[in-house]
Design a protein with these regions (language model features):
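Beta-alpha junction/loop-to-helix N-cap segments that form part of ligand/metal-binding clefts
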Residues: 41-44, 63-68, 82-151, 221-228, ...
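Extracellular/periplasmic Venus flytrap/periplasmic-binding protein
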Residues: 106, 149-151, 158-263, 298-308, ...
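Segments of small-molecule ligand-sensing domains
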Residues: 315-325, 336-396
Length: 397
């Protein structure tokens, strides 16, 4: 089994060579704490918390996974260099799952068997759901899943804490935007996986909740594939004013390009999981006019204290600013705040203390960005931005 211990801040993880070296275990050495070093009991002096993160470092969503990982690591490194959070250092063990739900579930089981204190930052709807299901008997804290299904937001699921808004929140924001423009002939293009089907269901429900006409059509395609011809043909027949996409960047780019080539002149709107940078790399100037949902502040929001802090640390690395990196940073900062609150409340940090601390974070002001770890349906719509991308890749609000 390959453990990735990410120590080196001076390299850019987004380069192909760097990614190859990471995956082949050449960088760094494995120096993991054993069970005796965990933070499950006792006072905080010299203690550490160990987190387990399964993330796609290869495969369909590797750009998203790497950026998210880098952002989280950047924050954890910064606090660890200052003797941790209230004296508690945070260590992250990372495994590549290649955007495979089966591998993510196996990785989650490995982490739990190794005795990590929480699962952190898993990426992908199917991966998050599978990891939760695989470890439900042990009920580990499951913090900041990236793109988990709305099923993991149910009030009776006490161990999952979501930093990002849900698919339902993004769907509601996008559909409401369409309504303000008088667009009531809406279709959905989605990938045939848990994320795509979940997003499709969320859009359909948002239309009901907003008392708008139902979808005029929907089409599914293989995950992150350019095999979209059947979907293009199906949706061109129903003549939608707007097409909402729940898909990764390759599928999204192929669908936009081929639908426009078929004569479509309507609006494309994307869920945040597509990633602005990956989609721009795939589409180039053809990205112009595409609308995207964003669940975290823009890297260009330099007037926001959170982003100023993020950019200050980023300047000390070779990493590139991105929405996904910011989201990882926010997740790490939110987890660290939970550690701080747990120590302040009990003088120690353990599972019960962390859970209580996270439950108290219903309106945490993180440098101008509000975090609610137990938000109800549609409560997080307020933090979502819709942005339009220009042909040269600039973001307009």
């Amino acid at each position: 089994m390959l453990w990735l211990l990410l120590f080196d801040d001076t390299e850019n993880f987004m380069t192909i060579d760097r990614r190859y070296f990471l995956i082949n275990g050449i960088v760094g050495t494995a120096c993991f704490a054993g069970p005796a070093a965990r933070a499950q009991s006792g006072k905080t002096g010299g203690r550490k918390i160990v987190l387990g993160q399964s993330v796609p470092l290869t495969g369909a969503a590797d750009q998203i996974g790497l950026a998210y990982l880098n952002g989280a690591k950047m924050y954890f490194d910064s606090v660890n260099q200052k003797n941790g959070v209230s004296g508690v250092k945070i260590e992250v063990r990372t495994l590549d799952d290649g955007y495979s739900a089966t591998k993510a579930a196996a990785n989650a089981t490995t982490f739990v068997n190794e005795g990590v204190d929480a699962l952190f930052g898993f990426v992908g709807t199917a991966s998050c759901d599978a990891a939760y299901a695989a470890t439900i008997a042990q009920a580990p804290l499951f913090f900041a899943p990236f793109g988990a299904s709305d099923a993991l937001r149910a009030p009776d699921i006490a161990s999952v804490f979501n930093v990002r808004p849900g698919l339902a929140d993004e769907a509601y924001k996008i559909v409401r935007h369409c309504a303000t423009l008088g667009q009531d002939r809406i279709a959905v293009f989605a990938e045939d996986d848990a994320m795509g089907r979940g997003g499709l269901a969320a859009v359909a429900q948002a239309l009901i909740d907003l008392k708008l006409p139902p979808l005029v059509g929907s089409a599914l395609s293989p995950v992150n594939s350019d095999k979209v011809d059947a979907a293009v043909a199906a949706l061109m027949k129903v003549q939608p004013q707007a097409i909402i996409q729940v898909s990764l960047f390759n599928s999204s780019a192929a669908f936009i390009r081929k639908t426009r080539a078929a004569g479509y002149g309507g609006q494309f709107l994307n869920f945040s999981v597509v990633g602005i940078d990956p989609l721009f790399s795939a589409l180039g100037k053809e990205i112009g006019g595409v609308v995207m949902s964003q669940v975290v502040p823009s890297p260009r929001s330099v007037g926001m204290p959170l982003i100023k802090e993020y950019l200050g640390l980023l300047d000390q690395t070779d990493h590139i600013a991105s929405y996904e990196s910011i989201e990882g940073y926010i997740a790490a900062r939110a987890f660290s705040e939970g550690v701080r609150r747990s120590v302040a409340d009990t003088g120690k940090v353990d599972r019960g203390g962390l859970k209580k601390a996270f439950e108290s974070m219903s309106d945490y002001n993180m440098g101008g960005f509000r975090v609610n770890l137990k938000a109800k349906k549609y409560e997080s719509v307020r933090v979502i931005d819709l942005v339009t991308i220009t042909p040269d890749g600039k973001v307009l609000r």
